[in-house]
């Protein structure tokens, strides 16, 4: 029997947004998630704006949701936010069939993925007085 799943606790300076059941393979989604990991949110939004990947628009909406959660629910400063974590999970796989020659059929698998983005407020290191 498996252990009970424990939810990840957010710290006081963090906020998150989750997009579930996205119609893209986890491998392709992870390419876009790796693009924004560790970057400041304004830089990450710019990267997603000009990315040519199809799923980049959905990732951008999820990041904007995480920023809005940080501002409205957790009272964090938007200018000091960085993308602390952006991780991808595997979801369901739809099975479809494709008719082939001689009366045969082959299976087509259409994968789905989950995306979780955690933004964290950081203090500026060298502030000028």
Curated annotation (Swiss-Prot):
The keyword Glycoprotein does not apply. GO terms for cellular component: cytosolic large ribosomal subunit. Belongs to the universal ribosomal protein uL22 family. The gene is rplV. This is Large ribosomal subunit protein uL22. Part of the 50S ribosomal subunit. One of its GO terms (molecular function) is rRNA binding. This protein binds specifically to 23S rRNA; its binding is stimulated by other ribosomal proteins, e.g. L4, L17, and L20. It is important during the early stages of 50S assembly. It makes multiple contacts with different domains of the 23S rRNA in the assembled 50S subunit and ribosome. The keyword Endoplasmic reticulum does not apply. Keywords: Ribonucleoprotein, Ribosomal protein, RNA-binding, rRNA-binding. GO terms for biological process: translation.
